[in-house]
Amino acid sequence: MASRRILSSLLRSSSSRSTSKSSLIGSRNPRLLSPGPAHGAAPCGTLLGRVAEYSTSSPANSAAPSSAPAKDEGKKTYDYGGKGAIGRVCQVIGAIVDVRFEDQEGLPPIMTSLEVQDHPTRLVLEVSHHLGQNVVRTIAMDGTEGLVRGRKVLNTGAPITVPVGRATLGRIMNVLGEPIDERGEIKTEHYLPIHRDAPALVDLATGQEILATGIKVVDLLAPYQRGGKIGLFGGAGVGKTVLIMELINNVAKAHGGFSVFAGVGERTREGNDLYREMIESGVIKLGEKQSESKCALVYGQMNEPPGARARVGLTGLTVAEYFRDAEGQDVLLFIDNIFRFTQANSEVSALLGRIPSAVGYQPTLASDLGALQERITTTKKGSITSVQAIYVPADDLTDPAPATTFAHLDATTVLSRQISELGIYPAVDPLDSTSRMLSPHILGEEHYNTARGVQKVLQNYKNLQDIIAILGMDELSEDDKLTVARARKIQRFLSQPFHVAEIFTGAPGKYVDLKENINSFQGLLDGKYDDLSEQSFYMVGGIDEVVAKAEKIAKESAA
């Protein structure tokens, strides 16, 4: 009991002293009060002093008037303070550059772009950290070779801003919006910052709607959602580039929309090949007809520093957002490869000294990817539908990078080498490709039942292939023989001549309407075309062309 009385008296003594001190300090400057460490040593020791000060400072803090929340609280805004201020480089570590400013008024906010002065080439830095002592840590958007301490750096007072609008169609830009196709500057009056908020919830379109591509296998079995995100899986040489170009062409013709291709960590050779193929196929037009081009390209090549590769996806998305929001377009955004986006952010995170997370990835993996993916959506004005090529490291689907990406996808389109070896193009695997849109509540009973019927026939054929390889077709039952015959016709009917491949194949491209597509495959499942040969189903558009081709083959064989 005696010890309790002593402790109680000590607390009262400390409280009275702290209260008197607090009132004195508070009368001079009430803002100096905080529930932090004691202003002076308490006679009863550090712990009792902290307890006493906390008990006395809390009422003072609660009495202070609470500031009203800002009108746009939670919304990302940019304080353009410090524009024109000059800092100096004080440290260079690879792609990370530290810059010191003279005073706090010239200090740039996070995500502000800075430009190095008196440098042989334009070098832009993006502010990432405030280190204290008026020093900011930045990420370089280009190589830092030749950069030395003491070099002047200009605060632009704005984030990285890139040109947008129709002037970008048919052009190739880098992460900063600078043209890299040697065709002169991009003349436009419209510019937007690459760091922007996702559309507000009230601006989003709530309905689910198919984006018709005119490609039979996609529209029937793995339809794309308007404003959705599609993962494109495929190795080299299976027709990924041709499929991308056909999607660009068909969306432009059917919906009047534009496309944006963002090469993230792209091989320079592949980027150049894509550009040349787009010119040959008419997706991009040069000279006086440039305004008729259907696609803008934004490249951050594999040899670029990690800062550029981490931001080039945002640059491409910003160009697409302008077409959606300002022009009300249905835009296709291609990102090749979304894994390289994650990889580049991981490199930047390591350079900034963050502690790595699982498998060495950055601790902000989910938020980095989410900031990009949440901006890809449908609004009441227009839509951005994204097709993202995905590299899976060591074919491990549980790797954090692809696993985080899968959570955002609405559909997957898998290109199969086995199907391409059969000469069936597009080589989309009808059994591995999936879509959230494949539901009777969204597509309707007719479309859903036809799609599931086609998949059932193809799956049964796949199960019978081992028996056929060992025993031959003669050992199958009549029902199984009919299943095999229909499955082989369906396989070939899923092939389709592309508009962008006309210059290679000589066959005119075909755009197949969704309703015609469903009716054609339903007729196949019902056995209406069992008497037609397999060959007549290969590389045609609708079922009418199949019948016409079968008649032509019959006449040629009769002659």
From Swiss-Prot:
Superkingdom per UniProt: Eukaryota
Keywords for the protein's UniProt record, in alphabetical order: ATP synthesis, ATP-binding, CF(1), Hydrogen ion transport, Ion transport, Membrane, Mitochondrion, Mitochondrion inner membrane, Nucleotide-binding, Phosphoprotein, Transit peptide, Translocase, Transport
Molecular function GO labels: ATP binding; ATP hydrolysis activity; copper ion binding; proton-transporting ATP synthase activity, rotational mechanism
Residue segments, region Disordered: 1-39
Phosphoserine: modified positions: S62
EC number in record: 7.1.2.2
SUPFAM superfamilies cross-referenced by the UniProt entry: C-terminal domain of alpha and beta subunits of F1 ATP synthase, N-terminal domain of alpha and beta subunits of F1 ATP synthase, P-loop containing nucleoside triphosphate hydrolases
Biased composition (Low complexity): 1-28
CDD domains: ATP-synt_F1_beta_C, ATP-synt_F1_beta_N, F1-ATPase_beta_CD
Catalytic activities: ATP + H2O + 4 H(+)(in) = ADP + phosphate + 5 H(+)(out)
Binding site for ATP: G234, G235, A236, G237, V238, G239, K240, T241
Pfam families in the cross-refs: ATP-synt_ab (PF00006), ATP-synt_ab_N (PF02874), ATP-synt_VA_C (PF22919), Synthase_beta (PF11421)
Listed GO CC annotations: mitochondrial inner membrane; mitochondrion; plasma membrane; proton-transporting ATP synthase complex
Transit peptide as recorded in UniProt: 1-54
Keyword Membrane: yes
Broad enzyme group: translocase
UniProt subcellular location: Mitochondrion; Mitochondrion inner membrane
Bilayer-spanning residue ranges: none
Family, per entry: Belongs to the ATPase alpha/beta chains family.
Annotated function: Mitochondrial membrane ATP synthase (F(1)F(0) ATP synthase or Complex V) produces ATP from ADP in the presence of a proton gradient across the membrane which is generated by electron transport complexes of the respiratory chain. F-type ATPases consist of two structural domains, F(1) - containing the extramembraneous catalytic core, and F(0) - containing the membrane proton channel, linked together by a central stalk and a peripheral stalk. During catalysis, ATP synthesis in the catalytic domain of F(1) is coupled via a rotary mechanism of the central stalk subunits to proton translocation.
Subunit structure: F-type ATPases have 2 components, CF(1) - the catalytic core - and CF(0) - the membrane proton channel. CF(1) has five subunits: alpha(3), beta(3), gamma(1), delta(1), epsilon(1). CF(0) has three main subunits: a, b and c.
Name assigned to this protein: ATP synthase subunit beta-3, mitochondrial
